[in-house]
Swiss-Prot record:
<dbReference type="GO" id="GO:0005524">
    <property type="term" value="F:ATP binding"/>
</dbReference>
<dbReference type="GO" id="GO:0006189">
    <property type="term" value="P:'de novo' IMP biosynthetic process"/>
</dbReference>
<keyword id="KW-0658">Purine biosynthesis</keyword>
<dbReference type="GO" id="GO:0009236">
    <property type="term" value="P:cobalamin biosynthetic process"/>
</dbReference>
<dbReference type="InterPro" id="IPR001636">
    <property type="entry name" value="SAICAR_synth"/>
</dbReference>
<protein>
    <recommendedName>
        <fullName>Phosphoribosylaminoimidazole-succinocarboxamide synthase</fullName>
        <ecNumber>6.3.2.6</ecNumber>
    </recommendedName>
</protein>
<comment type="pathway">
    <text>Purine metabolism; IMP biosynthesis via de novo pathway; 5-amino-1-(5-phospho-D-ribosyl)imidazole-4-carboxamide from 5-amino-1-(5-phospho-D-ribosyl)imidazole-4-carboxylate: step 1/2.</text>
</comment>
<dbReference type="GO" id="GO:0004639">
    <property type="term" value="F:phosphoribosylaminoimidazolesuccinocarboxamide synthase activity"/>
</dbReference>
<dbReference type="InterPro" id="IPR018236">
    <property type="entry name" value="SAICAR_synthetase_CS"/>
</dbReference>
<dbReference type="GO" id="GO:0005829">
    <property type="term" value="C:cytosol"/>
</dbReference>
<dbReference type="InterPro" id="IPR028923">
    <property type="entry name" value="SAICAR_synt/ADE2_N"/>
</dbReference>
<dbReference type="InterPro" id="IPR050089">
    <property type="entry name" value="SAICAR_synthetase"/>
</dbReference>
<dbReference type="InterPro" id="IPR033934">
    <property type="entry name" value="SAICAR_synt_PurC"/>
</dbReference>
<comment type="similarity">
    <text>Belongs to the SAICAR synthetase family.</text>
</comment>
<keyword id="KW-0436">Ligase</keyword>
<dbReference type="Pfam" id="PF01259">
    <property type="entry name" value="SAICAR_synt"/>
</dbReference>
<keyword id="KW-0067">ATP-binding</keyword>
């Protein structure tokens, strides 16, 4: 049996103690949640697809010199990652009006934005992740100005790369959410991309049909989430159509 020490469990992933100091194993669950887990369902195979898609993206970003927590994919559901101190912010980059931005500002969904917009949200489920400003972030000590600058510069680079990556397979990157962390190496610290980038955390539309290929299919009760995620993986060339996506998970340590 595969038993190990569980460090943390979130809505979509579990962190286990890694094989070496300074590492974790990140396990991708099949849980689908929306509206801060007010809506919840188990969708068989979702974790496998998110693991593969996120691995593909993080590997490309690493080759471009963008620092991330990713080390390698271990198996169908798990990644070996560097242990980082997570900054309690969700960083959202928006290219097209959708979701809360469209609702908040009365914009038509799908309307192109004049420029890409970066937003910050305080990670707190009990408060429904409120939107915050740079002044909030520094005043409450969540990050210092230089860290915010590093996060914004990395976000711009990541958005530029992802927009091109998805456009190359006929997918439009509408918006996406990221998390960043502090990676300590000896006496030095740097900001790195953490968590995941997948159809769970990004809005992805087919360029021709405008079909949604992301978690909005679950949020809006549209159905077909697994088929949409598989289509994203297929277009990116990272999963064969006949590849199994339902291996069993590890035994949890309570």
């Amino acid at each position: 049996m595969n038993r190990r020490h569980r460090i943390y469990e979130g809505k979509a992933k579990i962190l286990y103690e890694g094989p070496e100091p300074g590492t974790y194993i990140q396990f991708f669950k099949d849980d689908a949640t929306a509206f801060n887990a007010k809506k919840h369902e188990i969708i068989d195979g979702k974790g496998v697809l998110n693991n593969r898609i996120s691995e593909h993206i993080f590997s490309h970003l690493g080759r471009l010199g963008i620092p991330t927590h990713f080390i390698k994919r271990i198996n169908m559901r798990e990644q070996l990652i560097k242990a980082v101190e997570i900054i309690p912010l969700e960083v959202v980059v928006r290219n097209v009006a959708a979701g809360s931005l469209a609702k908040r500002l009365g914009l038509e969904e799908g309307a192109p934005l004049p420029q890409s917009i970066i937003e910050f949200y305080y990670k707190n489920d009990s408060l429904d992740d409120p939107m915050v400003t740079e002044e909030h972030i520094t005043a409450f000590g969540w990050a210092v100005p230089q860290e915010i600058e590093d996060i914004m510069q990395l976000s711009i680079r990541i958005n530029d790369f992802l927009s091109g990556l998805f456009a190359g397979v006929n997918i439009q990157l509408i918006d996406f959410k990221m998390e960043f962390g502090r990676l300590w190496e000896d006496e030095t610290m740097r900001i790195v991309l953490a968590d995941e980038i997948s159809p769970d955390s990004a809005r992805l539309w087919d360029m021709q049909t405008r079909e949604k290929m992301d978690k909005d299919r679950f949020r809006r009760d549209m159905g077909g989430l697994i088929n949409a995620y598989q289509e994203v993986a297929k277009r990116l060339g990272i999963m064969n159509e006949n590849e199994p996506i339902r291996p069993s998970g590890p035994v949890l340590v309570k």
